[in-house]
Amino acid sequence: MKIVLLGAGGMGELALKDLVSSRVKQIVIADYDKGKAESLAKAYKTREVQISAEFVDANDRASLTKVMQGANVVASAIGPFSEYGVKVLKAAIEARVDFVDICDDPQPTIDELNLHNEAKQADITAIIGMGNNPGVGNLCAKYGAQKLDEVEEIKLIWVHPAISRTGGAATLHAIGAFSGDVPSYRQGHWVDVPAGSDKEVIEFPEPVGKVEVFHSGHPEPLTIPRYISVKDVSCKGGIVPVWAGQEFIRFLSYGLGDTEPIKVRGVPVVPREFTVSLLESLIHRVGKDMIGGEQLTKVSRVIVKGKKDGKATSYTYDRIGNDWEAGIALAIGAQMVASGAITEKGVFPPEGCIEPQEFFEELKKRGLRISERMTTEHAL
C-alpha cells in the first residue's frame, strides 16, 4: 500500500503518525516546504515503513499530478480548503488516483461535490471532509439516524481551544466560519443564517462545563440532507475559554472578517487577511499567558432527534479530548479506501459512502471512544 500525504503541517503530521503506527508499507509526504517534509520523514521512518519526502506546489497542477503517480490513495491536509480543496481534487481526478481530504469549508465542499461525475468517469473514489468536524461527526449523525424510524433534527456542535496546533489555516477557517452568512437546513430547505447568531449554552461533562456556541460556517448542513431524510440540520461552534469566544465573535461583528479590501492610508487592505495576521501575532506573543495556563479541551457533540416505535427519541454522541484531531480520521479514511473497504466511485462526504460502525471500530483500535446516550419520551 502506497499513500501520498499532502501537507507537512499539524494535521499532516498527525495523519503520518497514524499511518506509520498502522504500518502502511510506503508513504510519501509532500509539501511546498520540502525541508519540513524531510524532517517528518526522518522523525517517523521505521524499519517496517518506507517514508520519503517530496516537493509539491499545490498551485501547479503538473506538480500535484507528478507526486500523486503510483499512489493507492492521496490524503490531502493542504489548507485552507477555500484555496486548495478543488485544485488538489482536480489533480487527483486527472491522475486517476483515489482521494481523501479534510475540507471543512462550505463553498469548497459544494465545488468538490460538483466534480462527482468527473471523478466517477475517472473511476476514482474521493471522500471529502474526512476529518473530525466534518467527518466523524457526520458518521455519528448517520449512525443515530439509522437507529430511528423517522429523523426530525440533527444538531452538530464543535468547541475548540483558542490556541490551535494547526496555526494559520485554522485561524483563517475560524474567521470564515463566524463571518457573514452561513448555511443551515430548515424544514427541508437550505437557508443562510447570520454567522455568530442564535447563541446557545451547552453543558458538557467536566473538564469542559458550560460553553457558548453559535451558528458557524461548516459543510455538514449542506451534505447530510443529501443522504439522510431529515427536516432540520444545524452546525454551531464555540471557542474556549468562553471569554475568548465572546471576544472573537464581537471582533468579527465589526467587519474584521470581511473579504472586500478597504483603503488604509491609500493602501488596499483585506480585513480578513489583517485579522489573521493580527491574531497569529497575538497568539505568538502572549500564547498561553492569554488563557492563564488554563487546560483547554476540545469537545464535539451530535444530537439526532426523531421517532422510534412511535415515541420521541434522541441519540447524543460526545467526543471529548484533544486526541480528537482531523489528521487521525484522514489517515483512517485513506486506509479504508486503499484497502478496498470503500468501492463507490465519485465524490462523497463521509456519510455518503462509509458505514459508521466499521469506522468506529477503527477508532476503538486507536483508543478513541464515542459516548452514546439515548433519551426516550415516556408518558406517565
Where are the regions that the model predicts?
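C-terminal catalytic/substrate-binding lobe primarily of soluble NAD(P)-dependent oxidoreductases
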Residues: 147-380
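ADP-ribose/adenylate-binding Rossmann-like module
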Residues: 80, 89-109
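N-terminal Rossmann-fold NAD(P) dinucleotide-binding loop
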Residues: 12-13
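Conserved Rossmann-fold cofactor-binding substructure of NAD(P)-dependent oxidoreductases
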Residues: 56-71, 77-80
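Rossmann-fold NAD(P)-binding glycine/threonine-rich loop
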Residues: 102-125
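Helix N-cap at the beta1-alpha1 junction of Rossmann-like dinucleotide-binding domains, i.e.
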Residues: 33-36
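Conserved N-terminal Rossmann-fold NAD(P)-binding element of oxidoreductases
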Residues: 3-7
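Rossmann-fold cofactor-recognition segment
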Residues: 46-60
